[in-house]
Every structure is written in C-alpha cells, then in structure tokens.
Design a protein with these regions (language model features):
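N-terminal export signals
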Residues: 1-18
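Surface-exposed interaction/gating patches
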Residues: 35, 127-207, 252
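Hydrophobic residues positioned within well-ordered beta-strands of beta-sheet architectures
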Residues: 30-32, 77-79, 122, 148-150, ...
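Residue-level recognition of alpha-helix initiation/capping sites
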Residues: 47-48, 166
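Short, glycine- and small/hydrophobic-rich beta-strand elements in well-ordered beta-sheets
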Residues: 14-24, 54-78, 84, 169-198, ...
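Short N-terminal segments immediately surrounding and downstream of signal-peptide cleavage
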Residues: 21-33
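Low-complexity, Gly/Pro
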Residues: 12, 16, 116, 249-253
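Hydrophobic, ordered structural segments
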Residues: 34-45, 51-59, 63-139, 156-158, ...
Length: 253
C-alpha cells in the first residue's frame, strides 16, 4: 500500500509540474521526419502538406508549421509542429480527424493503399522548449533563407542537463548577439539518440550562416563560458549531428 501511495503522489507531482509548465509558456515541438523512396511520394507529400495539413494545423492554432528538406535530395522531409501544451500533442490527431476539410483534401494521402504507400516511414521526436527560450521564433523571411538543425547527444541524463543549463545561463544570449538566430531549443522527451537536445537556427543566406559562426567562435563571452571546466565538451557531449536544410516553398517558417 505504501508503494501505491508513493506512486500516486509521484503522479500527482508530475501532473502539477505539467500544469506549471503550461502556465509558464514553454512550448512542445513535434519534429517529424518523413522517409521517402520515390519522386511520386515526394510530390504526394508536398501536396498533402501544402493543401491539407498546414492549413488545418493553422486553423486549429498549431501554426506556424515549418517544412524543410535537403536542397538536392527528395528525402527526408522535416516537419516542425508547435504545440502550446502536452495535451495538444495528444489531441492533434483527433482534432484533425474531425476536420472535414482536412479529411477531404488529404484523402489521397491519408488513404494511400499498401501497394502504393505515401511514404516509407515517419520518425518523430517530441521536444520541450528550454526555459531560456520558451517559445518559437521566426528569424528570417528572406527568399534565400537557410536553416541548421543540430542535435547534441550527451553520455548521461545529468550531463545532458548540464548542457541545457549552459544554454539557459548564457549560450542562447551569445547565439542571438552573434547572429546565430534560433528558431527553437528543445530537450528531447521522446525520440532516438536520447539523451539529447535539439535546436534549429535560421539565416538569410548560407553566407550569413558562415559569418555568424565565425563571429560566435571569436566572441569573448563564448570563450569564457566554454572554458569553464564544468561545461567542457568532452564531459557533457558524446555526439553532434549537423543538418543543413532549406524551407519548402509553402513552409510557414
């Protein structure tokens, strides 16, 4: 009975924590990765997202939605969806299912047969916004804008929290002042390569991206912060993934 009481108390604490997070304005981000095998699948996905999914998501308060891909390859396609709360993540599929316009315009994609699938697979991660940047930003509307998606893996949960602390304490501010314009920062709650944090940066151009990183690396505040023993990369990071992306013509970010 004592164990049950402890469990109930823990669940109550988690529920209270979730409510506090919702009230604090910290968003959740769903990062979907569509794996495609053919040009027809890419054409179908683009049509579904542009004509059905993005308009429906915007109608129900999930916008702006970002859609990104490699400039040269048809796959993968990344879709970034903003959620105001954890409940919104669970409710989204039911909200869209009750949207007649979405179901009608997305019918071909949603009902794709087994012998002609709409995609190979969908991979998805759920991210929780950092306290240092609780809400998404749209840093650029330039026609030639580019984005960087970066994933920092850590060797343990606590070292992962240390890297998040580093961002919240100062690194996010240093990013902003040196032209590394964040779209979001998120801690992976569900997904692969856990524990990890994931963030996205946006730039007017590839030249702007290169210039900003050069400025960042030379910044005195960054040198001081990264020189602190508790924030040494070899202690708190075990892998970094860097992905350069461009927005689709219908992306809202």
């Amino acid at each position: 009975m004592a164990t049950t009481g402890t469990t109930v108390a823990a669940l109550g604490s988690l529920s209270a924590s979730a409510q506090e997070e919702a009230e604090s304005g910290r968003e959740f981000y769903e990062l979907k990765r569509y794996i495609l095998e053919t040009e027809d699948q890419r054409t179908g996905l683009d049509a579904f997202l542009e004509d059905a999914a993005l308009p429906a998501l915007e109608r129900h308060g999930y916008g702006p939605v970002g859609v990104f891909t490699d400039e040269e390859d048809i796959s993968p396609v990344y879709v970034l969806i903003r959620h105001k709360s954890l409940a919104g993540v669970a409710e989204m599929i039911h909200i869209l299912g009750a949207d007649a316009e979405f179901m009608e315009k997305g019918a071909a994609f949603l009902n794709a047969p087994a012998d002609n699938p709409a995609y190979a697979r969908i991979e998805s991660s759920l991210l929780h916004a950092f306290t240092g940047m609780p809400q998404m930003s749209r840093p650029s509307d330039a026609p030639g804008r580019v984005f960087q998606l970066r994933i920092y893996e850590s060797p343990s949960v606590l070292t992962g929290q240390k890297k998040i602390e580093m961002f919240n304490v100062a690194e996010i501010d240093i990013f902003k002042k040196t032209g590394l314009n964040p779209v979001f920062f998120g801690e992976a709650v569900i997904g692969d390569k856990i524990p990890n944090l994931t963030y996205m940066l946006g730039f007017d151009s590839m030249d702007a991206q290169k210039a900003a990183w050069k400025t960042f690396i030379a910044d005195p505040e960054w040198k001081e912060l990264s020189g602190r023993p508790e924030y040494a990369d070899d202690k708190i990071l075990s892998g970094i993934t860097n992905i350069n992306l461009v927005p689709t013509k219908y992306s809202q970010i």
